[in-house]
């Protein structure tokens, strides 16, 4: 059994794919499997994949499917994973050579259900180092974790037993996947090293703001429904409420303000405020808002009047 299975969805990334695959082939942890899921690419990605398949047939599995998006490709690859731990890597990103060895060693040492590392936002002309908070327990995971999937090593049996998948056709797929997993993560560990280069492209999903930005509403609706149906909601309600409000009024709101179509932008901003106050009418009383930090100061000052002011400011910066 491989130690780590790495699922790599591929869609029209011929400019980036070799760097991504080289970073995986050259891992110091040798007992890995790389599962490439070709999500219906129409560029020269397949020629690059075939070159690596021919050279490394023992560690690369190749799967093809019709185009369905990032979540669909990840979900398609998961049943083929045989490793003790599972990881995800987007095919325009790349990793440091010792990443999976060091994360796997910590997982073994601490019997971890999940291991998380830090990463670098890599822009054409600059880099930004993302140094995450070390959080303790499930409550803090919901409250403080970076919800991206690709900086984590996750025990495969947890994913298999829970049957948790990425939501089809929605942005913010990592948000739903991570929050659904949290109740089953009894031990979370950290490697405080910048292992992943998170490459920023102008035409990437995250860089393009449109009406799909509103998918965050459906994603959190799915999370809340899952927690209620599985008996976790009352236990984690405070954290879910706080994370919902923080995400919608911070990073998500900034994206909403950048929606190009004026009517779509106006509707998205109205829906954001209405959704928050409909789902959590007493959110201003959430005890987690009392914690220190600039984001909490910002959230505590938020009301129906300041909301419009903040939206106006975010639209022009």
Each predicted region: which residue ranges?
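Membrane-interface aromatic/basic loop that binds lipid-linked glycans or pyrophosphate carriers
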Residues: 259-317
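Catalytic core of nucleotide-sugar-dependent glycosyltransferases
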Residues: 195-201, 207-235, 247-281
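Short, surface-exposed helix-loop/turn micro-motifs enriched in polar/charged residues
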Residues: 102, 169-170, 233-240
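Generic hydrophobic, helix-prone segments enriched in Leu/Val/Ile
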Residues: 6, 85, 110, 216, ...
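Nucleotide-sugar donor-binding/catalytic module of glycosyltransferases
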Residues: 1-221, 225
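Short, hydrophobic secondary-structure boundary micro-motifs
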Residues: 130-131, 236, 284-286
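Structural motif
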Residues: 234-244, 289-292, 297
């Amino acid at each position: 059994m491989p130690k780590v299975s790495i699922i790599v969805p591929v869609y029209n990334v011929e400019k980036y794919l070799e760097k991504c695959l080289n970073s995986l082939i050259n891992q110091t942890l040798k007992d890995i499997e790389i599962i490439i899921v070709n999500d219906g690419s129409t560029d020269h990605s397949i020629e690059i994949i075939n070159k690596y398949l021919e050279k490394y047939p023992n560690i690369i599995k190749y799967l093809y499917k019709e185009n369905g998006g990032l979540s669909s490709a990840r979900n398609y690859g998961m049943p083929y994973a045989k490793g003790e731990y599972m990881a995800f890597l987007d095919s325009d990103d790349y990793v440091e050579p010792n990443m999976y060895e060091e994360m796997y060693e910590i997982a073994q040492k601490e019997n971890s259900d999940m291991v998380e590392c830090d990463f670098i936002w890599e822009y054409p002309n600059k880099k930004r180092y993302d140094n995450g908070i070390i959080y303790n327990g499930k409550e803090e995971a919901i409250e403080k974790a970076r919800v991206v999937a690709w900086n984590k090593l996750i025990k495969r049996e947890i994913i298999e037993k829970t049957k948790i998948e990425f939501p089809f056709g929605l942005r913010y797929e990592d948000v739903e996947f991570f929050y659904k997993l949290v109740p089953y993560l009894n031990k979370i560990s950290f490697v405080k090293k910048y292992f992943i280069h998170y490459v920023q492209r102008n035409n990437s999903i995250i860089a393009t703001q449109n009406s799909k930005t509103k998918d965050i509403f459906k994603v959190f609706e799915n999370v809340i429904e899952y927690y209620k149906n599985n008996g976790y909601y009352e236990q984690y309600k405070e954290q879910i409420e706080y994370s919902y409000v923080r995400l919608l009024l911070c990073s998500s709101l900034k994206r909403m303000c950048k929606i190009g179509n004026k009517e779509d932008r106006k509707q998205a901003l109205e829906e954001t405020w209405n959704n928050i106050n409909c789902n959590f009418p007493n959110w201003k009383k959430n005890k987690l808002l009392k914690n220190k930090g600039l984001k909490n100061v910002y959230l505590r000052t938020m009301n129906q009047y300041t909301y419009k002011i903040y939206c106006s400011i975010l639209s022009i910066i």
